[in-house]
Regions:
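Extracellular/lumenal and peripheral-membrane lipid-interaction modules
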Residues: 1-137
């Protein structure tokens, strides 16, 4: 059994999983297993999400109202669940804290795992192609 994940699928699930709205989302899946995402987010949405810790929240005041968000993840399927590891996540070129990266990764993976559970699918491995990841069960 196979579960295909396309770049459009990732953009859609990411939009659902994030605790703040994003626009202009672009996703690139590479054969090396990298999932790269760019999106635009407003400073106000980030502030209201409570995802950004105190000191960084102050720094948000100095960013433009509309900010570029970039993230790159790798994926694995330990124990029949999709797990995402954040390689980097940046807002306007500034690296976000590890706790923020982990929270986003966990929310993103949880959304995928819910979808697979709804289809009674348990992944065992991932095959990477340009533009698509194929989970094999």
């Amino acid at each position: 059994m196979e579960f295909h994940i396309t770049e459009d699928d990732i953009a859609s699930v990411l939009t659902e999983a994030l605790p703040f709205p994003v626009e202009d989302t672009a996703v690139k899946i590479s054969r090396d297993g990298t999932i790269a995402v760019t999106a635009a987010v407003t400073r106000q949405a980030l502030t209201e999400s409570n995802l950004v810790p105190g000191k960084l929240r102050t720094a948000l005041l100095f960013l433009p109202e509309r900010c570029k968000l970039y993230g790159a993840w790798s994926a694995a399927v330990p124990n029949g669940k999709l797990s995402l590891t954040c390689r980097t996540i940046k807002l306007e070129g500034f690296t976000l804290p590890e706790q923020t990266a982990q929270a986003l990764s966990d929310a993103f993976a949880a959304q995928w795992n819910t979808r697979m559970e709804q289809r009674d699918f348990t992944p065992q491995t991932i095959q990477w192609q340009d533009g698509e990841a194929v989970l094999l069960g």
